[in-house]
From Swiss-Prot:
Binds 1 Mg(2+) ion per subunit. It is an enzyme of class 4 (lyase). SUPFAM superfamilies: Phosphoenolpyruvate/pyruvate domain (SSF51621). This is Oxaloacetate decarboxylase. Its cofactor is Mg(2+). GO terms for molecular function: magnesium ion binding; methylisocitrate lyase activity; oxaloacetate decarboxylase activity. InterPro entries: ICL/PEPM, Oxaloacetate_deCOase_bac, Pyrv/PenolPyrv_kinase-like_dom, Pyrv_kinase-like_dom_sf. It comes from Rhodopseudomonas palustris (strain BisA53). It comes from the Bacteria. Homotetramer; dimer of dimers. It holds the Pfam family PEP_mutase.
Amino acid sequence: MAWRNRRGALRAILSGSHCTRPASVYDPISMRIADDLGFEVGMFGGSVASLAILGDPDIALITLTELAEQVRRMSRAAALPVLVDADHGYGNALNVRRTVQELEAAGAAGLTIEDTLLPQAFGETQPQLISLAEGQGKINAALDARGDPSLVIIGRTGALAITSLDDAIERAQAYQAAGVDALFFTGVKTRPQLDAIAAATTLPIVLGGPSEAITDWDYLAERRVRIAVQGHAPIAAATRAVFETLQAVRNGAAPKQLSGLAAAELMQRVTRGDVVDERCDHFLGLKRS
């Protein structure tokens, strides 16, 4: 697979002048839908990965192997660049190296490495951060492990919601100095916070869950925010649709009584049925009806 074009597309977003909303994607079908609808980039969040792969909440139970396998399936299904939430890199700095290598091979356009202490330690009721020195070590390891220089590596900090704005800026500046391609912040709620972050750094910014108070897209673009992640509604919508459909079937509804189902034309489109038909005809001499 030629992943470099996708990585170049993500880099173009980060070096551009506007703020884009990524599609929250989690499997091959959601990747294809997002690609068909014209999204510029997909975001494969950690919480979504846990739901899609394990059916569990986001408590750091997923393994690197499971994540990489899903990213590979998604990357093969559509040409959409996908930015992968690689959580804490699945261990220490040496584990981070392996994480980068596996996700790069799986076709990720980019990935984020964060400084949250994961999994949550015994007896801790609130999220904690690793030390700045350990965070720098992880970022250095990630950059060193990158085989394709076009792979986007983003340093992520959760300090704003856990410690302070000053700490978030200090960590971001350290990751910037290490050589990351962009900075990812969670917990940004106000314009003064974002103004301070933008003034103290020079790299493109990715925001996770920005508050409504700052989601003016022109303002975000002026502050170098190039990607703003606004939750993961698609998997929640899909879960409700499956629940309601199965509930109706369990209550005795006949197939013709079910509503909200994808039309045959849509199913043909998202499964790339026309491509499969052509290949069956060409290689097997079969006509699929």
